[in-house]
Amino acid sequence: MLETLNAIDSFVWGPPLLVLLVGTGIMLTIRLGLLQVLKLPQALKLIFCAKNDGHGDVNSFKALCTALTATVGTGNIVGVATAIKAGGPGALFWMWLAAFFGMATKYAECLLAVKYRTVDANGNISGGPMYYIQNGLGKQYKPLATMFCVFGIMCAYFGVGTFAQVNSIVEITKISAGIPVLYTGIALTILVAAVTIGGLKSIATVSSKVVPGMAVIYFLTTLGILIAFADQVPAAVALVIESAFTTTAAQGGFLGATVMLAMRSGVARGVFSNESGLGSAPIVAAAAKTNWPAEQGLVSMTGTFIDTIIICTMTGLSLIVTGVWNGELNGAAMTNSAFTSAFPAFGSWLLLVGLVLFAFTTILGWNYYGERCVEYLMGVKAILPYRIGFIILVACGPFLKLEEIWVMSDIVNGLMALPNLIALVALSGVVVAETKAYQQHLKEEAELVPVKLAEETNH
């Protein structure tokens, strides 16, 4: 089974998809004039200072936090560990590169989500790649939108949304606290059911309260590890850069890695972590209260910066400076070893709290993403059956194998990204035009011109 999945994964994440994924980010970076660098201060300011007086269901901050619930998850802890285990320290460099260009991609997809959003039968905002494919490219491209939704549901049901998160939670609770898998699975299922029944506003409320605090705590913990091993940090950074362009030899429990494997592992896990180009973040960005698509694009862009450039970097360097990356461990167990190396008395508990909160909120965010995909395909009546199915799969997650889960997640992530990337390339001219209009508005301090919501789409 694992060999078959690995073969499919190698095909899906082969050179064509890597070129399309990174190439789309490079193209958007050029067309937008290095926006992710020049406008980053403005974007960070907007997180807390956006006016939030336009159409939408939640404010920009809550929309960002909900997106971060799905991105800041096990990919930042377990995903980085598995990437380095498979591709060596050089995988971290390729995560950085993918994230840098991915910021432009995230900006573009979230801008388009607001521009082409619509209203569903319940009066709620609906948006995302399926809507900017259909309403931006034309209804003749609806099969592409359908393809995105099918793979989006697969991601939510069988990949990053449930199995990968649940499995990581039960693994770390068993390692750190000795709690049986069954008990953790039952408790997690009950908690997920309690929050998801409340829909987006319930998820957004939980996210806005949990995400900022947990991100700061995790950052400070990993910073403590780097301070404890400060003499190893320069060598670790040098190893990351060197390993990105040269084959890493086998050593200890590390089997060795080629440059291509480092690149594939880094980019694939980077997408798993920050979701730039995947098309998931635009689904919740569409619900933000804003009159300017570019404004929410800037806010959403910071998610990739926070997720990968900051959090994944701290995790990756912690694994390298402590020397656990080339040992026998993998996944959460590897990260746990790094934490206990620096903090023997309480390292496991710090990781336990961080990973459980990260993974739990990721489950909530992906429940919403899958819900919107189901609604697009089958209407609002299908939402409740979808939620029930999601909760059942959360209950099944603890009993699956870690290696198979991560490979399966990579596969469906790649398939989900494909239709979205095609749409981003085709609609890049719209992104540039909207960006220029917004920046000109800021210069002239003109009156806001609200974005008109499209009429409810009949599917």
Task: Identify the role of each PLM range.
Residues 34-60, 82-84, 88-92, 104-140, ...:
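Flexible loop linkers connecting adjacent transmembrane helices
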Residues 24, 28-29, 101-123, 130, ...:
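Helix-loop-helix module between adjacent transmembrane segments
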Residues 17, 32-36, 75-80, 156-170, ...:
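Transmembrane helix-loop junctions in multi-pass membrane proteins
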Residues 9-42, 85-123, 144, 307-314, ...:
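Extracellular loop-to-transmembrane helix junctions
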Residues 1-74, 84-91, 102, 395, ...:
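N-terminal alpha-helical transmembrane segments of multi-pass membrane transport
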Residues 54-86, 112-130, 134-136, 147-150, ...:
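Alpha-helical membrane segments and immediately flanking helix-loop junctions
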Residues 29, 107-121, 223-239, 247, ...:
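Extracellular/periplasmic helix-exit of transmembrane alpha-helices
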Residues 20-27, 31-44, 166-173, 180-241, ...:
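Membrane-interface loop-to-helix entry segments
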